[in-house]
From Swiss-Prot:
It is an enzyme of class 3 (hydrolase). GO terms for molecular function: exoribonuclease II activity; RNA binding. This is Exoribonuclease 2. Involved in mRNA degradation. Hydrolyzes single-stranded polyribonucleotides processively in the 3' to 5' direction. It catalyses: Exonucleolytic cleavage in the 3'- to 5'-direction to yield nucleoside 5'-phosphates. Residues 561-643 form the S1 motif domain. Its EC number is 3.1.13.1. Pfam families: OB_RNB, RNB, S1. The gene is rnb. It comes from the Bacteria. It comes from Salmonella enteritidis PT4 (strain P125109). Its main location: cytoplasm. It is found in: Cytoplasm.
Length: 644
């Protein structure tokens, strides 16, 4: 009787349209209930029974109910699931398998089975890649997933690496393929094998892609020749090896090992500028005046070189600082080091006055045992030999940026536009409260940005610098020449690491076209997007493996009185994040560890400060002593507290 009643249908429709709804993202808690976060200000309570229909991170539409003046959300429609493809640990055995996603806020096991075509017999503790197949808000009874890939077994010492690479869908090994012979590129190569080229790298480096040679001219100016490994002499554009490199975009450097962009035969041997081996190279010759200015007369050319020495950063630095026992093999090598040192000092001086120089931060190196155990974490400060190479590379990349811009009008450029224009007024207002007066328009120019950076560098602490970081834009990869505000340069195009960066290989091909006087097409925009995405994934992978290894390394310090110096890097409502100075580990200090009485404590992300009873006790960039309260291995998080 009521089945096809149009009045009833209309009434239903009316009720549906009058019921308040909200769209937002589900936030789970450890207590079973959750919240629907609509925006920064508004959220609705989701009761535990309703949370069974959704997962943390799902974007949903929910019906809003009001009972006794209390609002709650009932999930109704799934807009975008949080989980699609994920990694996790398998539970159970035989026919009843489930998988717990490897995520700090997802604790529930999801029933699953091996997907068709997956041969592995899954058992308790295995790590796997899974894909969601069912969701309660899609009309299914429950969540369900397919296991699409076996990663490794529970006790594999190398779980951090294999799981992280699988999570980000990154390659686990070097690409297959061999390059049998050099291509005929129609390039005349200058024979520079008699010159005393040297490489300076870490002692363990095998993929050497830059060699340096300096000489003093009669007028006292210095001439620098930068010779770069030449993989495009072996790899034809559009070939199988080229396409594999294009997808990888970069060599992926993880703690303990790397996954190269090119086959190891090329990256570590045929292309690597090994000592006493003749190698093809792409070279740039520049003349540097006493004040560090690079003359306009820049020459790019193809060459053949033979490195005369594989030098290590620490040895060269010790020798220049008159420390240690290491000596160059002969006077020719010693002379090169002295000249390169002079170039470094004059270029560094030029950049201080005319561009920008990054503050030196140490690199942290994990020392690993054969089973992936962390034996030590060593802070490696950037020493004078590192700076020699850095100044030479920046100079060479600046030369390439100019030549590509002037001769072609395009290339693969690293572009950074400083501050987002939308933030200029807020930035000027913030600086004013700290006694720095800047013009909101001027600070958006390269000159204005450099001027401000120099003023910030002259401040007694880095606190103000840390406050304005959020107003900065991100660096991008572009085919269009543009300024790099972060370096303080009008244009910057890298070509000095073609063994490990696909963008540098592209710039090699463009520079070779310039050398030959040939026309060449502008690189496709989708290549820059692929490179940006891969750079993001590689950085996340490096961070994830690092978090895992830091947790392993500091696990036995939890609950002890061992003190660590730690720099405060961020303040949030819930507490502060710190970086341990000696090893680089990131730890979290919950607000209750800062002060027991919550009402007397104000943690302000906006101001980067922690106030107790109205007084600023901690601020970002302060260095404090902490102890490790707890290490949570399942989430790889380190909880610290201020040392008593």
């Amino acid at each position: 009787m009521f089945q096809d009643n149009p009045l009833l249908a209309q009434l239903k429709q009316q009720l549906h349209s009058q019921t308040p709804r909200a769209e937002g993202v589900v936030k789970a808690t450890e207590k079973g209930f959750g919240f629907l976060e609509v925006d920064a200000q508004k959220s609705y309570f989701i009761p535990p029974p309703q949370m069974k229909k959704v997962m943390h991170g799902d974007r949903i539409v929910a019906v809003i109910h009001t009972e006794k003046e209390r609002e709650s959300a009932e999930p109704e429609e799934l807009i975008e699931p949080f989980l699609t493809r994920f990694v996790g640990k398998v539970q159970g055995k035989n026919d009843r398998l489930s998988i717990v996603p490897d995520h700090p806020l997802l604790k529930d096991a999801i029933p699953c089975r091996a997907a068709r075509g997956v041969q592995h017999e899954f058992k308790e503790g295995d790590w796997a890649v899974a894909e969601m197949r069912r969701h309660p808000l899609k009309g299914d009874r429950s969540f369900y997933a397919d296991l699409t890939q076996y990663i490794t077994f529970a006790d594999d010492h190398f779980v951090p690496w294999w799981v992280t690479l699988a999570r980000h869908n990154l390659e686990k090994e070097a690409p297959n393929g061999v390059a049998t012979e050099m291509l005929d590129e129609g390039l005349e190569r200058q024979d520079l094998t008699a010159l005393n080229f040297v490489t300076i790298d870490s002692a363990s480096t095998e993929d050497m892609d830059d060699a340096l040679y300096a000489e003093e001219l009669a007028d006292g100016r210095l001439q620098l020749t930068v010779a770069i490994a030449d993989p495009t002499a072996w790899i034809a554009e559009g070939s199988k090896l080229d396409n594999a490199a294009k997808i990888r975009a970069f060599t992926n450097y993880l703690p303990g090992f790397n996954i190269p962009m090119l086959p190891r035969e090329l990256s570590d041997d045929l292309c690597s500028l090994r000592a006493n081996e003749v190698r093809p190279a792409l070279a740039c010759r520049m003349i540097i005046s006493a004040d560090g200015t690079i003359d306009d007369d820049i020459a790019f050319f193809a060459a053949t070189i033979e490195s005369k020495a594989k030098l290590a950063y620490d040895n060269v630095s010790d020798w220049l600082e008159n420390n240690g026992t290491w000596q160059p093999d002969n006077e020719g090598i010693a002379h090169q080091i002295r000249l390169l040192h002079r170039i470094c000092l004059s270029r560094s001086e030029w950049r201080h006055h005319h561009a920008l120089v990054f503050k030196d931060r140490p690199d942290y190196r994990f020392v690993l045992g054969e089973k992936g155990e962390v034996l030590d974490i060593v802070a490696e400060p950037r020493r004078i030999a590192n700076r020699i190479v850095e100044e030479s590379m920046i100079a060479a990349n600046l030369c390439a940026a100019r030549v590509l811009r002037d001769k072609l009008g395009f290339g693969i450029y690293n572009v950074h536009t400083g501050f987002d224009p939308a933030n200029a007024d807020a930035l000027a207002a913030l600086l004013k409260t700290h006694g720095l007066h800047v013009d909101a328009e001027e600070v958006l120019t390269l000159e204005g940005f450099c001027k401000l950076r120099r003023e910030l560098d002259a401040q007694p602490s880095g606190f103000l610098d840390s406050r304005i970081r959020r107003f900065q834009s991100f660096a991008e990869i572009s085919t269009e020449p543009g300024p790099h505000f972060g370096l303080g340069l009008e244009a910057y195009a890298t070509w000095t690491s073609p063994i490990r960066k696909y963008g540098d290989m592209i710039n090699h091909r463009l520079l070779k076209a310039v050398i030959k006087g040939e026309a060449i097409a502008r690189p496709q925009e989708d290549i820059t997007q692929q490179m940006a995405e891969r750079r993001r994934l590689n950085r996340m992978a490096e961070r994830d493996v690092g978090d895992w290894l830091y947790a392993r390394f500091l696990n036995d310090k939890a609950g002890t009185n061992t003190r660590f110096a730690a720099e405060i890097i961020d303040v949030s409502r819930g507490g502060m994040r710190v970086r341990l100075v000696d090893n680089g580990a990131i730890a979290f200090i919950p607000a209750p560890f800062l002060h027991a009485v919550r009402d007397e404590l104000v943690c302000s992300q906006e101001n980067g400060t922690v106030q107790i009873k109205g007084e600023t006790v901690y601020k970002v960039t302060d260095v404090i002593d902490v102890t490790i309260a707890e290490v949570r291995m399942e989430t790889r998080s380190i909880i610290a507290r201020p040392a008593a």
